[in-house]
A protein has these predicted regions:
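Re-entrant/interfacial helical elements at transmembrane boundaries that shape
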Residues: 173-174, 257-264, 295, 337-345, ...
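Extracytosolic (periplasmic/ER-lumenal) interhelical loops and adjacent juxtamembrane/interface segments
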Residues: 239-255
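Hydrophobic alpha-helical transmembrane segments of multi-pass inner membrane proteins, especially
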Residues: 29-238, 278-338, 363-367, 382-391
Length: 391
């Protein structure tokens, strides 16, 4: 009797475990389409952690999309100051490395125990909210050079702190975001072109201030453009390896086992992170790469259409700033992987491994949805050189 009872208990326990395993597999299967990276990178602890980050991101997206986005205008300045405070905290010399974890020579992450927080990611959202809030309150001020000073200061503060880490990749994304928001706010294009031209002429002066590894990347990139393969085994190893994997993918990609073998034996650094687009193309070919870019295109188009139909100045500027961040990040990351841009350490939104990056881009998505759900008025009309408001 005891034997029969024990046998029945074991069968029920086995069925329960099997059921939990199926539910876990079903959850991962349902979430995988939301993250192309899992299709291409070997599963394991990374996949489990990224599943958690994705769930957190989706929950954050839903929460952010519920209250009217106008409430976030009130939180813009505290959020901006908080983000600046975190960026300053990273640079404090007395903070131990057990808390601020250096990676590749950069002090850009705070160890929270369960995850590493990257303040530069959160700063993108806080910065966009702050600039959008400022430009809404200063309607028409951007028509003059003097009116561009304050948005410029708001931009250069986080840029300077990120360069100091050093995190040149994240810092570079703030310039296109600022330009996009100023255009929507009604700034004169002639003024913006002049500022861009002056910045381009002043760019060489920044070179001496770069870290040695950043200078090496630029030197390697110039050599790469000239067809010099002598650095393929040292400073350009990552770039040439990524390009070889992109070429190996061809039009239709490689079978799963062969693609994994190619990625493994070529020892591509950061294959789950900055260089994941090369892995996608190796596995799914040019078709998979174009499909990935097409999905980003749909996200950008949907966000811009949401901005177009909103008659609220803050909402429009906010969306365009967020779109500029995502679009610029995709452009730079893909450019790094195919060899048209130098490698500067930028993740691929929605795809690369990393909790801060993934949660941030889903919060951005939630803000875009929020503007769409709480929009007022109709398509944007222009009057007097800058958009009308319905604040």
């Amino acid at each position: 009797m005891r034997s029969t009872s024990a046998s029945g208990w074991r069968r029920r326990t086995a069925r329960a475990r099997s059921s939990r395993s199926r539910r876990s597999s079903d959850l991962k299967g349902a979430l995988r389409p939301l993250n192309w990276g899992w299709i291409c990178v070997i599963a394991g602890p990374i996949e489990q952690k990224q599943t958690i980050f994705l769930v957190v991101g989706l929950v954050a997206c839903a929460i952010v999309s519920l209250p009217s986005y106008r409430y976030f205008a009130v939180l813009a300045w505290p959020a901006y100051l908080g983000a600046i405070g975190l960026l300053v905290f990273l640079l404090l010399p007395f903070v131990p490395e057990s808390i601020v974890k250096p990676r590749n020579g950069a002090r850009g992450w705070i160890d929270l125990g369960f995850m590493d927080l990257q303040p530069a990611e959160l700063a993108k959202i806080a910065y966009t909210l702050a600039v959008a809030s400022y430009l809404r309150a200063r309607r028409g001020s951007t028509r003059t050079f003097l009116g561009l000073v304050a948005p410029g200061v708001l931009t250069f503060v986080p840029i300077g702190l990120m360069i100091k880490q050093p995190d040149l990749g994240s810092a570079m994304l703030f310039a296109p975001a600022l330009l996009a928001m100023l255009v929507v706010a009604g700034a004169r294009l002639g003024h913006l072109f002049l500022i861009v031209a002056l910045a381009a002429m002043a760019a060489p002066a920044v070179y001496p201030m770069l870290e040695s590894h950043q200078k090496q990347r630029i030197i390697g990139y110039v050599g790469q453009l000239r067809g010099d393969r002598s650095t393929a085994s040292d400073i350009n190893f990552q770039a040439f390896t990524a390009q070889s994997l992109v070429g190996a993918g061809g039009v239709s990609g490689q079978p799963d086992a062969k693609a994994r073998a190619l990625v493994h034996f070529n020892h591509l650094p950061e294959r789950h992170n900055d260089m994941i687009f090369a892995v996608i193309v190796c596995r799914h070919g040019q078709r998979g790469g174009l499909m990935t870019l097409g999905l980003y295109g749909l996200w950008v188009l949907g966000a811009l259409l949401t901005a177009w139909v909103s008659a609220d100045r803050f909402g429009r500027i906010l969306i365009v700033g967020l779109v500029a961040f995502v679009a610029a990040q995709v452009f730079v990351n893909v450019g790094m992987n195919i060899g048209v841009l130098p490698i500067i350490g930028i993740t691929l939104p929605f795809v690369s491994y990393g909790g801060s990056s993934l949660v941030t881009v889903w919060i951005m998505t939630g803000l875009v949805l929020n503007v769409g759900l709480h929009r007022t008025g109709g398509p944007v009309r222009r009057s007097g050189g800058y958009p009308d408001d319905n604040d």
